[in-house]
Each structure stands twice: as structure tokens, then as C-alpha cells.
């Protein structure tokens, strides 16, 4: 009997296990699926950045969705998947119902297979489950494998982020926009409202949230928050690009002591439980700005906190970028804790009266110097760290890279209005001298030399380097206003902030101190003191160039949106101020060959030029096409400037884009240009301009194709033609009239 009981017990175990499995299968809830819209977004952003997808959408044409659905957030993502065969419109129609419906196993398998045949097997799709919803949990596991195939650069990545605000709790917040500890992000298709004041682990790419991986809870620390106002019940703070009121967990009576300070806020379920104010402040001239530190006069290099803030507190409080900290500025205060800068506070606008110039080496070939030698007829104040020394007149300061002299920035300030002469430099004028002060810093690449100088003094050494002093005064005054405006705008770009400079002294910005100052050019600067060009109240980017071909062009030559600089227009240099347009290549070729086309700068040698070249010369600059068989301009920009050049060869063809690249491809140091006046000019490795036409003239005895290139003008062709301005001044036009001719809709005002 016992034996049979044991047998029944053993046989019963499998039955019990099978019964439990059946119960689990019957009663376990189905895993939630992922919508096709959400899946499409994740796939599209694995393949393209949001910017690339936006560009693709503009060229794509008509959407596959109905007109009343085109505005839905998911349309571009799904359109991209349909267009690239990740989804089949015959099986998955392009409509709202299917977009918001769940992705199926079959569809997930198709997407995986399109990326890699090996990925399809991970989906586990079969005939029985093919039309069932593919679980969201499984999709995100699969997504990790998809990223290894589609996003090998790791553009889609995981971040920890705190959500400060969404359209639900912030009035005026744009749809699908979240203010976060990572800045302003978009979250198309996600639901984030319930995550305000939560810390999340998320997947994102270039500012677009893709998926919330984990909610880390509501016990968070908001670091480096600016306190605007408050009362016993809560604080009004500036956090994540927004102003927001946050309540206290318990009433706090000393709120007035917190206002106008930076603090860390300890949060619990959306309420403040602790305020840690950071009161230590330092200030000093900004000498350089690095990725992880700021160099301050009197303090040296101070590291940045990992969650540092840059805040403009005058007017409306606004968060800025590290690049907005202007080197040379003395209007910044820095809030420090534990030896690190937690915030840079800008309490007033930066003055425009000084500029910091990186002095290039000989020949303007490098920003670094191996050796620098400086003398001065007067005494010099030498500053390094917290040490100050007065040097006698005629002292020689000699520094060699790597000698340890300038591992900390060396500042030299001439006394009694003297200038510092850099004996180790050679310019067109000889050995240059500099007003203001000079700074030397040794870097791993060599010595860096920076000149800080008054803006007007800087301009007096720019104008003679950019325009001959023999030119008409009104042309020189127009140049002075242009140069001042250009210098102001470029100085705000902080291009060399890591070295402590804003611009350099080469043609990349404006040539500075290459030619001796002149009384006439200095007078042009003085008579236009402080005057700049404005459009809608903002200083313009006052581009200028040497000589036109009879017409200018606009900023489209640099792939910029012309609408962003409406004052830069394509126009002819004639009294009518009309726009020249060319219906065909033949029309432009006819124009550029005309030496007698009337224009204000038609008398200058580079108004027209031409030269002979060959397939061999062009092939030396254009690789991968074999023996050259043909060259032609296939696209022109406003005014006829060449934008695309098709080069055909025995082994293929290539298209060169951009006027500068075309000038380089067709140029060569061996070329001899015949100019407007019949004289010749050699050494043009970069052609004078992109206003050109090219004609095939036959082949030589070796079968090499020969060409003649006809061109006109010198420079990029955007903004003011300097020789055009001279022609206008000779015709009796004043400097304001000249400037308003070249820059449409501008006003000329004195900078406050």
C-alpha cells in the first residue's frame, strides 16, 4: 500500500507542475506593447540625428499620411521608416490608427532584418505570434542590439536627468518641451508630466528624449539654483531655463536672506526640505576660458563645478553658455564652493571699449611662437600671478617655449603711453609695436601672445592694413565703421577664449598692425568714433572684401540662411543698385568676359582676370577621377558665384561644393593671371574669387584637356567692396551713403 502511495505521489508531481504552468499562462497578464509611433521614433533616431531627420523631411516631399494627420508628432519618423523599407505601407497603412496601435512581432522582425539579418532571430517571430503585439519590454532589450548596428558612434546614449518643468506646470512652455538638469529637451510622444521633480535614467540623442528607462525617485538635489524671490511658504527660483515657484516642506521665516543667491535645494516629493546657500564670491578680469576651468587675473586657473551655471542677472535672468563669458571681461562675479566655480554671474553688459587679439607668428602661419622677445622705451609693469614688478626702460623680456618662464600667464603693461615692441616678429612694416598690454602664456604647442588694447586704438592699426591710406576719406570712414562693427561682433564669438583672446590679427578676422598707422586713417577712425552698423537694433556682421566683378552675393555662399542676414544682399555696383541674374551659363560667361561692364570698381586690375590651365593641373588638386575629361559649373549662387563644380575623369566624376573649395581646386601656384589692365600676376593657389566661368579650349599633343577660366573680382563678394567704396567716394558719396548702399536697411549709431 505504501508502495502504491509513493508511486501515485511521484506521478502526481508532474501533473501539479503542469497545472501550475497552465494557471500561470492563463492568468498572467499580457506584456504591454509598444506603439508603432514610439518604435519608429527610436529607430529613426538610431539612424539619424533630429537635425538630419528634419533636413531629410524637407527634401522628402509629400507625406504618406493624410493631410489632416501630417502635423502629428510621429509622421516624420514613420515616413522615414516607410521610405527606407523598414515598414511596408501595404501591410501597415500610414494612418493614425496604425501609428498609435501596437507594433507586431512581424513588423519588429522586418525592422530588425533591415538593419542586420542576424538581428531578426532575436525577435522570435513566428506564424502564430506574427500579428500579436510585440512587448515594449522586449523591444527595448532588442533596441540595445539595434543600436550596435545602427549607431556605432554611440549618439544615442543614457543620461541621468531631473525634470524641472513641462507644459503641464510651466505656462507658455512649448508643446513636447521639457526643462531639465540637462537643459531644454524635447520628448515627442512620451508622457513626462508625472515625472516633474523626479530623477530619471533616459535614452536620448541630441536633445531629444527617446525612452524613460528608470524612475529613480523624488528625493533629489537641485544644484546651483538661482533664488529670485520667496516668502515663508516657498521660493521663486531660476532653474533649467525657467522661473518656477517651489514650496517648502515646512514654513521658512528667513527667506529674505536667500534672495539673490545661488543654492543647492534638497527636494522630497516636489517640496524643499533644505537650502544650502553658496556665499563665497570672487571677481577679476577673465584671462581665458577652458572646457573645465576659467583663468582669472589674481586667482589663476579655477576649475568649474560639474554642474556650473552661467547666468545673466540684469534685466530678465537668463542662462548662458560658457562661450558667453567674454575674455577680458571685468563684469563677471564667480560663486565658488570647495575651490570650484559653481556659477558665473553677469550683472551688467560687457563694455565694448577693449579687444583682445591673438598675435600670429611670422607670415601669419601659426598661432604659436617658439620664442618671443619684447622691449619698450619706457618702464614696464610685469605681472605674474600675485607678483608685480617694475622693469626699467629698455629692458629686454625674452621667453622661449618650454623654459618654464610662462607656465603661468605673464602680463606686460607699458607705462607712460609707451608701446611694446616685439623684436621676434616681422610684419610688412618691419618690427611691430603694440599699445595696450601684452600677455604671454606657454602651452604644450608653443607660446601664445595676446594683445589687449582699446578698441579705437586697435582700429587705427586695422584700417591702414585693410585699405590704402591714399583712398578717399569717405571710403576710409566707411571702412572704419565696417571694421568697428565687425570687430565688435567677432569679439563676442570668443573664438580664441582658451588662449584668452577674441580674434587674431590675420585675414581670418581683420589684418591688424601689419602696416604703420597713418594720420589720414587715424582721422577716419576718430571722425566715426564709436559708430557701428545696426539692423533691427542689433550690430550686423559687416563682411567686406576687396573688389567686385560688378555684383555682390549673399551669405548663401557659406551655406548660411540668407534670411538670417537680410542686410547682406546680392546687388550690382551701379547707380541703379539692381540685382543681376543670369538665366544660363552662357549668360554668365558673356557677363564675366565683359571688361567694359560699368561698375564703381571697374577700374581696378582684379575687376576682370583670366588664365589658362590644364587637366593635369586640375587633377593635382582633385583626386579620384583619373585623367580629367571635362570641368563645368553646375550650380551658381546669387550674383552668379560658382557653388558647384563638376569634374569628370577617366575613372569617374566628383562634385566640388562651395566657392572657396572651387577657388582652391582650380587654383595653382604655377598659374599666371592676365588682369584687367593687361598686366600679369603669378602664384594664385587660391583664385581671386568664385565669380568665374570655365571653357574647354581643346587638347595638347599629349591629349591633356586645356581650359581657359574667365573671372572677376577679389574676395568672397559678400558685403562691402572696398574698391567699390573708393569708387563711390570718388563719385561724391558720403560714408553713410556708401554703407547703406552695401548693407540693406541698416542704421548707423554710436555704440553706448
Predicted regions and their residues:
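Aromatic- and histidine-enriched alpha-helix N-cap/loop-to-helix transition segments
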Residues: 31-38, 100-107, 131-138
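Short linear loop/turn motifs
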Residues: 92-104, 743-744
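Conserved, single-site charged/polar hotspot
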Residues: 2-31, 37, 48-50, 54, ...
Amino acid at each position: 500500500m505504501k508502495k502504491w502511495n509513493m508511486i501515485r505521489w511521484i506521478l502526481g508531481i508532474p501533473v501539479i507542475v503542469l497545472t501550475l504552468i497552465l494557471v500561470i499562462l492563463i492568468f498572467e497578464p499580457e506584456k504591454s506593447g509598444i506603439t508603432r509611433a514610439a518604435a519608429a521614433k527610436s529607430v529613426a533616431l538610431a539612424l539619424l540625428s533630429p537635425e538630419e531627420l528634419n533636413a531629410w523631411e524637407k527634401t522628402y516631399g509629400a507625406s504618406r499620411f493624410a493631410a489632416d494627420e501630417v502635423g502629428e508628432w510621429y509622421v516624420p519618423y514613420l515616413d522615414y521608416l516607410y521610405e527606407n523599407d523598414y515598414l511596408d505601407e501595404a501591410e501597415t497603412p500610414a494612418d493614425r490608427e496604425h501609428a498609435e496601435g501596437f507594433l507586431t512581432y512581424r513588423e519588429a522582425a522586418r525592422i530588425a532584418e533591415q538593419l542586420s539579418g542576424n538581428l531578426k532571430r532575436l525577435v522570435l517571430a513566428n506564424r502564430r505570434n506574427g500579428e500579436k503585439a510585440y512587448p515594449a519590454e522586449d523591444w527595448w532589450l532588442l533596441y540595445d542590439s539595434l543600436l550596435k548596428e545602427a549607431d556605432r558612434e554611440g549618439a544615442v546614449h543614457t543620461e541621468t536627468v531631473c525634470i524641472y518643468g513641462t507644459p503641464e506646470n510651466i505656462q507658455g512652455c512649448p508643446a513636447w518641451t521639457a526643462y531639465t538638469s540637462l537643459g531644454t529637451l524635447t520628448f515627442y510622444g512620451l508622457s513626462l508630466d508625472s515625472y516633474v521633480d523626479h530623477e530619471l535614467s533616459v535614452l536620448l540623442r541630441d536633445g531629444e528624449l527617446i525612452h524613460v528607462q528608470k524612475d529613480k525617485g523624488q528625493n533629489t538635489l537641485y544644484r546651483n539654483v538661482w533664488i529670485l524671490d520667496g516668502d515663508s511658504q516657498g521660493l521663486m527660483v531660476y532653474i533649467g531655463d525657467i522661473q518656477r515657484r517651489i514650496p517648502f516642506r515646512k514654513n521658512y521665516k528667513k527667506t529674505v536672506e536667500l534672495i539673490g543667491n545661488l543654492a543647492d535645494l534638497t527636494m522630497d516629493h516636489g517640496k524643499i526640505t533644505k537650502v544650502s546657500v553658496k556665499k563665497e564670491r570672487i571677481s577679476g578680469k577673465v584671462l581665458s576660458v577652458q572646457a573645465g576651468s576659467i583663468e582669472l587675473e589674481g586667482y589663476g586657473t579655477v576649475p568649474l563645478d560639474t554642474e556650473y551655471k552661467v547666468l545673466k542677472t540684469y534685466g530678465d535672468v537668463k542662462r548662458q553658455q560658457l562661450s558667453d563669458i567674454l575674455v577680458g571681461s571685468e563684469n563677471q562675479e564667480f560663486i565658488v564652493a570647495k575651490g570650484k566655480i559653481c556659477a558665473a554671474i553677469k550683472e551688467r553688459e560687457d563694455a565694448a571699449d577693449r579687444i583682445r587679439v591673438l598675435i600670429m607668428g611670422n607670415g601669419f602661419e601659426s598661432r604659436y611662437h617658439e620664442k618671443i622677445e619684447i622691449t619698450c622705451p619706457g618702464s614696464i609693469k610685469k605681472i605674474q600671478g600675485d607678483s608685480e614688478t617694475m622693469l626699467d626702460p629698455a629692458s629686454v623680456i625674452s621667453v622661449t617655449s618650454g623654459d618654464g618662464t610662462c607656465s603661468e600667464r605673464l602680463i606686460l603693461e607699458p607705462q607712460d603711453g609707451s608701446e611694446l615692441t616685439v623684436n621676434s616678429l616681422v610684419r610688412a612694416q618691419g618690427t611691430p609695436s603694440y599699445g595696450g598690454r601684452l600677455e604671454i602664456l606657454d602651452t604644450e604647442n608653443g607660446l601664445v601672445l595676446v594683445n589687449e588694447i582699446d578698441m579705437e586704438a586697435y582700429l587705427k592699426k586695422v584700417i591702414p592694413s585693410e585699405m590704402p591710406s591714399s583712398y578717399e576719406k569717405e571710403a576710409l570712414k566707411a571702412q572704419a565703421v565696417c571694421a568697428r562693427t565687425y570687430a565688435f561682433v567677432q569679439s563676442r564669438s570668443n573664438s580664441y577664449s582658451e588662449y584668452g583672446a577674441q580674434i587674431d590679427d590675420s585675414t581670418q578676422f581683420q589684418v591688424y598692425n601689419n602696416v604703420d598707422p597713418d594720420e589720414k586713417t587715424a582721422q577716419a577712425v576718430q571722425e566715426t568714433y564709436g559708430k557701428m552698423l545696426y539692423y533691427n537694433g542689433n550690430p550686423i556682421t559687416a563682411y567686406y572684401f576687396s573688389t567686385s566683378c560688378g555684383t555682390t552675393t549673399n551669405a548663401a555662399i557659406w551655406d548660411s540662411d540668407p534670411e538670417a542676414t537680410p542686410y547682406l544682399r546680392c546687388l550690382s555696383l551701379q547707380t541703379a543698385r539692381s540685382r543681376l541674374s543670369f538665366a544660363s551659363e552662357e549668360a554668365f560667361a558673356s557677363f564675366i568676359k565683359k571688361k567694359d561692364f560699368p561698375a564703381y570698381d571697374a577700374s581696378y586690375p582684379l575687376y576682370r582676370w583670366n588664365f589658362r590651365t590644364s587637366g593635369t593641373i586640375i587633377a593635382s588638386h582633385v583626386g579620384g577621377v583619373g585623367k580629367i575629361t571635362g570641368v563645368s559649373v553646375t550650380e551658381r549662387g546669387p550674383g552668379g558665384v560658382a557653388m558647384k563644380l563638376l569634374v569628370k575623369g577617366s575613372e569617374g566624376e566628383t562634385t566640388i561644393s562651395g566657392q572657396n573649395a572651387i577657388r582652391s581646386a582650380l587654383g595653382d601656384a604655377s598659374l599666371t593671371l592676365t588682369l584687367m589692365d593687361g598686366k600679369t600676376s603669378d602664384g594664385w593657389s587660391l583664385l581671386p574669387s568664385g565669380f568665374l566661368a570655365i571653357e574647354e579650349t581643346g587638347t595638347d599633343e599629349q591629349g591633356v584637356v586645356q581650359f581657359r577660366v574667365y573671372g572677376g573680382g577679389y574676395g568672397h563678394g559678400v558685403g562691402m567692396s572696398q574698391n567699390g567704396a573708393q569708387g563711390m567716394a570718388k563719385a561724391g558719396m558720403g560714408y553713410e551713403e556708401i554703407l547703406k548702399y552695401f548693407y540693406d536697411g541698416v542704421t548707423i549709431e554710436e555704440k553706448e
